[in-house]
């Protein structure tokens, strides 16, 4: 993989050409962006273009010859460790199934990729070295020539210099030139030797003289707040990540509510007393029962009772009176009410008069006093007669506690507006709704679940508000009756911002921090991206913040102070979740008027009038992205206070019409809610930031040139070290720039606050069926693919076809051609979409069967509606209850479907398309998620996953991603991982490791069919990361050495050849597993199994353990491979080949590269396995099959099933333990000591293991399983950055040692050397105070426990909390133990100032001032000084030969003393301390350099 970069312009050209190709509109699988058609495949091609040797413009636009270039990187499957034989279940033998532990899989594959990267970079380095060597030769020639000329001039001038001063001065100048040239020649010569060593294949580079090459040395990675995260920076980011602090550095106090409570009581004590008196008076009147129940409470403490005593009587008579009399009475009562209000105001204190004056009769329905222009109608005045004035006053003024309760479902009010009427009023296609809601068995009751009605109808809003006011008053009276003073004080922030206490206390700590952060943005007149991971309650944080703004009623400068509290607000969201927003607003803060600007809203008049009404009453307008674009002119006509984009990544295309429409709002208060703020590339991140903070990241062309291209190029696996470091620096700068305005918390960081259940996400690699394999291969070999590869045809059609074949071959071929008139029962296998023709559907069938028995509930996602239709037919045939929602489901019926599924536990499956069901939908009723096919955009699949694993979920969630091994879906999955790594590089960790080998066009259209002994390409790429999943097993779980029972099974297998295996024995094992059903809870193998950690122990165990498991490999008709007469398993895949004997090859394949970076040679491997020849030869005659056909499987079932029942009662109780069948033993489990709180987790884990065991045990087409989270979370820092940091640390340590040695006196002086406590020679300058013990407090050294500001940018090795406390380099700590109490000498002060400046000045400036440092004081000590001294002393005095040591001696001495993290530093220290050479015998010798002898 040579480093062949391709200009960015070619990528753009390719994208333009790709975008010009039309894409099918009938398929949701068509790969395009909603926001502007920015295709994912175009991203894929543009990213893979680096290093593939093929012009992207030739790929998409012009015809070109087939690819010619270096060989592609092929992952060697033999180097990935599969399940150890001792760890395999008995049922797995003969099935051809490989199971991987996810960590091992990921590490192993990454090791292979790293090796390939290393080899490619080595080849690239050699090319660069050759060029550099030629340049050095030119410089050498030029320098030698110049030196000769200078010598001639000196020879000519020397005789005349004694007689002429001018000539003497010229001669001195020429001599200085000669000296400079000589120095330059030394450097060039040293560089030449260095390059010669590289070109000559030397294993260790010749170290140059640092003094001579100091100017040419490349500066180490900058100082270094960046290379390794400092302690203070880590603590800072940890507080932000865990939701305890905002990015601006403010934290919410632990006991914040007490202080505001006292303030509120002091400020409004009279008003609180008034409310208490009124509530008490109302309670006494109700208790008397004297028809005074509806008497009004005047605002004054003393209320004249006469005018309101008989209020309830007219209400009873009003039902009989005529309308005119009724209206007359209402007018009289209204006048009385106003008179009482004005009369009561006379007696109020002056402090309350301005507040009371806001309570205009016109705004009674508008509880927030938001300048509503609404006047109540006469029909509503009857409702107002039942309203209590004190409740409205309570709402607007006090901060009393109100427990949120759902609105009562019964009663006359709700009967007036039935759900059927709501749906039919504002969506005409009710027939489609009924059909969508009643899909599946027992689906007729879907229409009973209603959506939350919005407040487009102001009458409804007034009624809802009055009901809420009544509930508040009733609740307050109840608390007063019980003398419950549990009212929560408001949460107060800076500048008068308050959040109602009852609302704020219900937020999690990280959500409270989010509200605080939103307020800080508000004060700065800036927008922000709330990027919390999906399911962490971003909606609630926004509602709480908006409620706080409205509740505080403060004017801010952002809108020229024209809005008191909260002004009109626009919320743009996907259509699926519009009514979800309404529900949340009505639940958390009912006073808001929330209207939906959409066809599904309750407003039936012109949309323009709704926009005007909401803007004037300062309400909340919820609309969709399409309406923002369509009604852009009408909406932008008004001044909006806040614009909030839910799922704001919809505007990720900066040139899309919807993006430009959203950016035209005239307000600085812009908020984006997105769980995936960066999905594909940095261009999308720029688009989002340009909305919330225009100009923050400059213009797009400049941003792309300065940030996007360097960061992206540095993320490729074949990037040069310069590109890697450049990408790191740019990522650090970009991260620091956007950090304050992007708040992102992950579930893993706030999991303790949420009490979220565990999530288990795995990737199932499914085998293609024979028919799928044939169709796929035929298409790959077709003319269409040839034309695509030649650039004569666009790539989209080919990719879509491949994805269809992976899902189901009938989607591509159209299915079997059937004759008319044949009965349906005979056409089952020939029907379109028959499930046994798709490998993934076979897996789904097994999953659903197991989960249905366990009582789990499932979400089944697919990209394609056609695939959903096939799955729907399958579910009907299997008699499963289900619901379905796709793009054709009407907006009006989506929320009722979601609500129904969450509430009705009898519905087993919910079928959804990934895009429709993946945005903002809350489906916590399910705890199992199946993603049937992957999407190019990783956030699309992530959104689907997060539907179930979010706040409100009580059960453990299991997510299965289905991929077909060796097909285009694996390439899509790789692309997802690369995009996620790119996102992490900017948003999370700039040191994110590189990935993504440069896939080219040819590689997309290939098919690799891994068999049982082969691993998938993904498994190979991520080997060693622990992503492979071991097969769960019920037997042979605890054996570490070969079991005794296995030895006794050997003669049995020798006595009975494979052709004579009893069918009854084969069936009995399956009968047992089926009889157990869902109650069997398999236990997974321990991930810390010594067999996995120690390859040598693994090799010693494999033979006998595999022997014991091979004896019972055939366990049932569904698991049987077709056994031929000679005892070998026949191969039904059509290739006519059989895999190698598992005892000889497969174990070696899996152990080859799992633990070593360099694979052992073939000769070593063969020699290793020669010792195992006698142990393994007895089953060499047996082979595993790669695939087996469904037809042969069904043939066996027909012959074996009649014999199952008689054997069931006889053998179902006898299970095997340690390889021996124990009479009456039903089953066994591993004994585990676990606490009571861990039992439920173990049970859930056992359920997942049981599912995996069944998947692997049956011939359901599962090839292997990987753990997705281990891939995403297990990425280590980039090795180039680690090496650079290790080199820098080593240079600092050597510099400190060199200076220290210069300060020490020789042996002839007789002065003891400084030991840290005693001695004089070489002691720090601070120890040489000889002029008194006086101490100046202004210049004394701070105690080491105090936190120094330099800790934020210290450049030592990162010290994490909970880890070993080692002294940091440049930590600001004192150099000696007693310096805190002694005076600070001037030399020591200068030393500390220079140490501080070392973090700021460039290295070249430090080198220039090096002589000053040497003359004055030492650099502060580093944590590696002791190691360096120990290394030097060992090589100088303790090795076999003084002054030098062999590599073997050094390893024996230091290998046990070093941790893995110290290896890089140790290597650099050794290279700088010694020179290396090899003896004639090939032994490596390290010899101390003269200055360290």
Curated annotation (Swiss-Prot):
EC class (word): hydrolase
Family affiliation: Belongs to the SNF2/RAD54 helicase family.
Name recorded for this polypeptide: DNA excision repair protein ERCC-6
Post-translational modification remark: Phosphorylated in a cell cycle-dependent manner at Ser-158 by cyclin A-CDK2 and at Ser-10 by ATM in response to DNA damage. Phosphorylation at these two sites promotes the intramolecular interaction of the N-terminal domain with the helicase ATP-binding domain, thereby probably releasing the inhibitory effect of the N-terminal domain on its ATPase activity. Phosphorylation is essential for its chromatin remodeling activity.
Region (Disordered): 1-39, 287-323, 344-453, 1042-1147, 1181-1247, 1318-1384
Residue ranges of the region described as N-terminal domain: 1-510
Positions bearing the Glycyl lysine isopeptide (Lys-Gly) (interchain with G-Cter in SUMO3) cross-link: 205
Species: Homo sapiens
Domain Helicase C-terminal: 843-1002
Pathology noted in the entry: Cockayne syndrome B: A rare disorder characterized by cutaneous sensitivity to sunlight, abnormal and slow growth, cachectic dwarfism, progeroid appearance, progressive pigmentary retinopathy and sensorineural deafness. There is delayed neural development and severe progressive neurologic degeneration resulting in intellectual disability.
One of the GO BP terms on file: chromatin remodeling
Keywords linked to the UniProt accession: Age-related macular degeneration, ATP-binding, Cataract, Chromosome, Cockayne syndrome, Deafness, Disease variant, DNA damage, DNA repair, DNA-binding, Dwarfism, Helicase, Hydrolase, Intellectual disability, Isopeptide bond, Methylation, Neurogenesis, Nucleotide-binding, Nucleus, Phosphoprotein, Transcription, Transcription regulation, Ubl conjugation, Xeroderma pigmentosum
Phenotype upon changing residue 205 to R: Loss of sumoylation and defects in transcription-coupled nucleotide excision repair
